[in-house]
Swiss-Prot record:
Classification of source organism: Bacteria, Pseudomonadati, Pseudomonadota, Gammaproteobacteria, Vibrionales
EC number per UniProt: 2.1.1.191
CDD domains, alphabetized: AdoMet_MTases, PUA_RlmI, RlmI_M_like
Record InterPro entries: PUA, PUA-like_sf, PUA_sf, RLMI, RlmI-like_PUA, SAM-dep_methyl-trfase, SAM-dependent_MTases_sf
The protein's name: Ribosomal RNA large subunit methyltransferase I
Keywords of the record: Cytoplasm, Methyltransferase, RNA-binding, rRNA processing, S-adenosyl-L-methionine, Transferase
Catalyzed chemical reaction(s): cytidine(1962) in 23S rRNA + S-adenosyl-L-methionine = 5-methylcytidine(1962) in 23S rRNA + S-adenosyl-L-homocysteine + H(+)
Main subcellular location: cytoplasm
Amino acid sequence: MTAAIYLVKGREKSVKRKHPWIFSRGISKVEGEPALGETVDVFTHDGKWLAKAAYSPASQIRARIWSFEKEEINKAFFVKRFNNAQLLREDIIERDGLTGYRLIAAESDGMPGVTIDRYQNFFVCQLLSAGAEYNKQAIVDALVECFPDCNVYERSDVAVRKKEGLKETTGVLHGEEPPKSVVIEENGVKISVDIVGGHKTGFYLDQRDSRQQAMKYVKDKEVLNCFSYTGGFGLYALKGGAKRVINADVSQPALDTAKFNAELNEFDISKKRAVFLNADVFKLLREYRDQGTKFDVVIMDPPKFAESKAQLNGACRGYKDINMLAMQILNPGGTLLTYSCSGLMDQVLFQKIIADAAVDANRQVKFVERFEQAADHPTDTAYPEGFYLKGFACKVL
């Protein structure tokens, strides 16, 4: 008999609106002894069936809903999810010429705690919830059925697993170990991805649309690409006809890959055209400001500054300082392309931070375009938390 949870009276409202999370304070009773990640039936306080969910006794999010239908959570269930997700993305894949894309965007694709990115025939999984871990083999078996030639690699080396009572883990789940370099293509740009050692699952696929949109601002411009990682924005800037691109990052291996990516695309990377600079971006911006060095375009794509609500105030200060510095080194009429991937910081707050940075920089700034995560990272209407990446193009006068 399947274990069950019963909700506190009134707490069924969010479930009826199809939100996939049930918090510990919303549960009045647990029937049976569900294991970590085991599937449970969800009932209202008076016994009306609501959903199938994964139980996570160690987490404040005590249950994550797999389905609002009375169906088994097994290989066949995941096959259906994968087929639906692939179908949703077919137009995007064809339009942008993608060999790297997000197949599963967790809750937004009906798979709580499961992220799967595809790089050629390597499918990289992050399993961040107890339910995902419990169903790991069924998830892998379903991937193999849907994509028979696939290799599956796990990158669950993420601290959030501890909140679910899980250890961090990585490794081959099916097929071959990924090579050091897997080359993908997007919008005609080739990019080398290090699946095993790179950030996240290897690359920032969510910024693909923003990279493409950035091209219209860079022709014949001096561009500073901050937190460049393996050069994604820098590659598009070179493709867009930038006069010169400085890629700045604290990681030398990432910069080496950025240079390799530029060569892979046969871009001119003479020192007059492309620079790969190992530097702390905060210090570098202050040095440029103090030296009077100016740019026409500054691209500001920092790592996530806020992992929790307790870190949000500090993150706000960090975003304000770094954008203020960027504004101070822009030529009059220059463009600031700035982004935040912190889900806790909504677009309204981020816009206010940019406005505060403009005051501190003593520059007049106009918002001219807004950006968000790429189209293969959808946001379900019932799960607004799925919208996390936001950005602005700003004209700095």
